[in-house]
């Protein structure tokens, strides 16, 4: 399976615990391509949600369905960044633009006080 940073994939996440991400949902591949091309069994992703109200939260990014291949407008929720097993990635949906990727890094910088 070939994955690249900025790709959007469907992920079959397990049942959520508390307010964590779960179930089948789109995710953005956040992990760098050096690691994506390696033999690592895991990949770092940012889960997406169709709850567009979360776009108002600091660091989150509203992704337009028309620009990404997503079935509906969604929000990259940077506070839920997780590492998952690659086998949970089921189908590539699309890709975020370089502009969105830059906004994603700014959101992560904010999350980590950088």
Predicted regions and their residues:
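Conserved functional hotspots at enzyme active or ligand-binding sites that engage polyanionic ligands
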Residues: 1-114
């Amino acid at each position: 399976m070939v994955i690249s940073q900025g790709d959007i994939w469907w992920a079959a996440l397990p049942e959520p615990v508390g307010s964590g991400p779960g179930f089948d949902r789109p995710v953005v591949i956040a992990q760098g391509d050096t690691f994506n091309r390696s033999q690592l069994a895991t990949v770092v992703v940012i889960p997406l949600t169709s709850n567009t109200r979360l776009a108002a939260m600091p660091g989150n990014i509203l992704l337009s369905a028309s620009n990404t291949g997503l079935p509906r407008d969604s929000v990259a929720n940077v506070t839920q960044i997780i590492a998952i097993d690659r086998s949970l990635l089921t189908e590539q949906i699309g890709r975020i633009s370089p502009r969105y990727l830059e906004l994603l890094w700014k959101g992560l910088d904010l999350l980590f006080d950088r």
